[in-house]
Amino acid sequence: MRFLAVIGALAILVGIGATLFFFGGFYSVAGTAEDPAIVTWALTRVRTASINRNASDQPPASINISDAATVQAGAKAFAARGCANCHGAPGVNWAKFSEGLHPDPPDLKDVVGELSPAQLFWVVKNGINMTGMPSFAQAGVKDDEIWSIVAFLKKLPVSEADYKAWTVQPAPSH
C-alpha cells in the first residue's frame, strides 16, 4: 500500500512539474530553438502515424501520375505555387525566409521515395500542423492540380534542364 502511495505522489509531482514547465513559459517555442530529442521523436511519430492512417486517396481515373504531361503540369504548379521557396527545386535555391522555419522543410528529392502517392497527396492537400506546410485545399487548390504536383514529386530527382523546360512560361503573343 505504501508503494502505491509513493507512486501516486511521484505521478502528482511529475504532473505538477510538467504543468509548470509547459504552462509557465519554460519550454521555448521560438523558431530558433532546437526541440529536445524526445519532442522531435514524439512529433515525428505522431506525424508519421497520422499520415499513414489518413492517406488513402487515389488519383481519379482521368489522371495518370506517370504521364509526362501530368508531370510537367505538376512541375509548373510546384513553381507557380511557390513550393520551391521552402523545398528548393533543381537549379532553384530555397528562399532566405525558409531558413527560419522549424522544423526545416525537407529537400523533397530526399524524402519522396519514402512516401506513397496517397501520402504525398494527403500532405499537400491537408498540410502539416506546426511546420509551416500549408493546406493547399484550404488555399483553394483543386485535387487534380494536387495530383499533378504529386506526379512531379514522384518523378524527383530531375535535372535542372528538365525542370527549367517544364516550368518556363511561354512569352505572351502579340
Predicted region positions:
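Short glycine- and Lys/Arg-enriched binding-loop motifs that mark or flank ligand-binding interfaces
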Residues: 70, 91, 123
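Extracytoplasmic electron-transfer domains, predominantly the class I c-type cytochrome c fold
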Residues: 100-156
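Extracytoplasmic/periplasmic copper-protein system
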Residues: 160-174
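Periplasmic c-type cytochrome electron-transfer domains
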Residues: 2-72, 137-152, 170-174
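Periplasmic/extracellular electron-transfer cofactor-ligation site
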Residues: 75-102, 126-130, 134-135, 156-162
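Short, flexible segments with low predicted structural confidence
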Residues: 45-46, 95-96, 121
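Short hydrophobic/charged patches on amphipathic alpha-helices used for structural packing
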Residues: 72-75, 121
